Design a protein with these regions (language model features):
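Alpha-helical transmembrane segments and their membrane-interface exit regions
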Residues: 49-52, 76-83, 168-174, 193-195, ...
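Pore-lining transmembrane helices
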Residues: 8-103, 117, 139, 185
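Membrane-embedded alpha-helical modules
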Residues: 124-208, 215
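Transmembrane alpha-helix boundary and packing residues in multipass membrane permease domains
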Residues: 25-29, 58, 86, 148, ...
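Helix-loop-helix junctions within the multi-pass membrane cores of secondary transporters/permeases
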Residues: 72-162
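Short, Lys/Arg-rich, polar N-terminal cytosolic tail immediately upstream
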Residues: 1-8
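C-terminal ends of transmembrane helices
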Residues: 82-91, 115-119, 171-178, 216-228
Length: 229
């Protein structure tokens, strides 16, 4: 793991690290607002590390949800990670000792950083994956602790903080559209998502849309490799 790879990886991850720090501070504030201390912030951000699911978990904890309800909700919220993993099978197959952690730490934003870049020849690709994944999680853990501590010291109005995660998704999408010449995946995802939203409703559209998007992109894989659209 050379110095150049470390520096390059951190620079690449810096936008997500910044966003994660802000979002996780919000999570820490909400956690404290629900009556859970910084120890819970460390535990959840280390052991769960799934931004949107951590926000959902707060509601599940505060309402005393059953294990079955929690399991079903977790599956529904994080089912998209299954599709991320499918696309990374080849990349992660030779990751060696890094592989278990890479699988665990594959979040939406980390996926957006590791699935698209054309890395310089002198940058170790597997080390890049690992460092980006690690620093992203460390920034999330640090922000969670800071938010929890601040929430204990200073009173905050936490209304609307959970929308920050959605805002980050939108920003990442716009950055990807700006950098990439291939806009067909985003257009395909948008059209299919709207279709499934209208067909299945806001509470049921996520899984069908992810399945249809994955099928559509596999079908269009060859044309995507040739196209600049």
């Amino acid at each position: 793991m050379n110095k150049k790879t470390i520096i390059y990886s951190i620079k690449s991850a810096l936008p997500v690290m910044t966003g994660y720090s802000v979002l996780s501070i919000g999570f820490g504030l909400l956690l404290q607002d629900k009556g859970y201390g910084w120890g819970w912030a460390v535990l959840m951000s280390t052991g769960i590390y799934a931004g949107s699911m951590q926000f959902v978990t707060l509601n599940l904890l505060s309402t005393g949800a059953s294990i079955i309800t929690t399991a079903i909700m977790t599956l529904m919220v994080n089912i998209r990670h299954l599709f991320y993993g499918i696309t990374m099978l080849e990349e992660y197959s030779e990751a060696g000792w890094r592989k278990p952690y890479l699988i665990f730490s594959l979040t939406d934003e980390t996926y957006s950083l590791i699935c698209s870049p054309d890395l310089p020849d002198d940058i170790n690709r597997k080390d890049y994956f690992f460092i980006v994944s690690l620093v992203n999680q460390l920034s999330w853990i640090a922000g969670s602790i800071i938010g929890s501590v601040l929430g204990n010291i200073i009173p905050f109005d936490t209304t609307g903080i959970d929308f920050a995660m959605t805002a980050l998704f939108v920003i990442i999408l716009l950055e990807q559209l700006e950098k990439s010449k291939q806009h067909l995946p985003a257009i395909t995802g948008f059209i299919i998502s709207i279709f499934c939203l209208l067909l299945f409703g806001p509470n049921q559209f996520l899984i069908p849309s992810m399945i249809l998007i994955t099928i559509a992109l596999f079908i269009e894989k060859k044309s995507l490799e040739r196209s600049d659209f």
